[in-house]
């Protein structure tokens, strides 16, 4: 009986044969998994960022095009209107808020569209020009056209792209100009409506001021929003100063560098007929919270004729996403 029990113990402790095929299969699976994870890491760390950067870049280029359509539509309304006539056809401009993502690997990049109606603070644009006309009854001297009697405009439309891979950018439309701002600076993509010409000894300046009015709104997230522009009125005035007066343009904006560079380049151009002694551009800044505002003052001397157009445009932003 003891011999049989010992035989059983020996039998239980017998070592099983090593399965080489199973080991090879396990190692092959692990190696394949490592190769897959390596390629997945390369895809997510290199290809996905490049893909998303391209998506965000294309989206910002699309926003620039959409802001160009907005400017073109408003300019067309003003050009095609008669003085005092209310435009009957509104202009619709779609604005896509987001940049496309990469399915599974990267979410879409959100954007923010903001509208600020004309107001006494930011932003505003005013002009001042002394004329040959007599001052209104009860006032002495000559009439001065300025911000108190029709020479002031305001309002802005802005888009902020919260890009994660491409540089973060803000695009703004104010007083008929399109401005691009980013972390390393800002530039004027399309200027306001202004023309400076010299006919003989007569210096002529023509300016169109555009005021945006409506309900202040900020919409962020995804989808496409609709911006509707309607011309409320457009007026034209012509002022003269036979001896040549100083035309002063004052701008209060967050994008002071772009405005300063724009006017400096404009007034330096040979086509204006101005010498460097006949114009001046100065800029000052002030801090409100964490936002810096700039006051840009432009003075053009010896202006004989000032032609001024003032347009009021109503802006609405639709909530429905597409």
For every predicted segment, state its role.
Residues 25, 29, 33, 53-60, ...:
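Short, charged/polar micro-motifs that form catalytic or ligand-binding hotspots
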Residues 313-315:
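N-terminal targeting/regulatory segments, especially signal peptides of secretory
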Residues 17-46, 67:
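N-terminal single-pass transmembrane signal-anchor helix
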